[in-house]
């Protein structure tokens, strides 16, 4: 009796992965461009760790400053400056103070989840959630949930794309933002794209990225 050949199992595919970069990220000012609905948009984004520590919500914390500006057909429509407060080693976000087009808000995390030590293409998960308050008060005015997802580079190469998502409401208005970071060698090389809700419509911004995909 002739034996049938053994069936071969396909080799498992090795998914691309990179060490997670240390937080907060250090992103030099990046130019953003977009067009939507016949309008032309331009902007800048940066994320800069600050020196020293300060008090936040009753405890000593480190901080970083995130800046986002957007113009529509040459006219300013968004000026946002966030000061993010966090603990180091391990990184744990505490909250932030937010200035958005002149309005002042506070945000406190109710829960936070660190990025995994290794980012693998196809992976995703929670980053945290919290509550918005009127500045310097206990009056809650909204909430926010943050998640992440990892994808391969759209241009090939060894870099991967880490996208963080933030969705929620403030004063009854929905907010939505997605930021795509180029990750290589355990470092955030730059911002590839920003998606942000403007007047109820999500607008996709591409960045110059200044060669951050060249790996």
Q: Over which residues does each language-model region extend?
A:
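Predominantly extracellular/secreted and cell-surface proteins with exposed
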Residues: 76-135
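Acidic, serine/threonine-rich low-complexity disordered tracts
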Residues: 2-76, 136-215
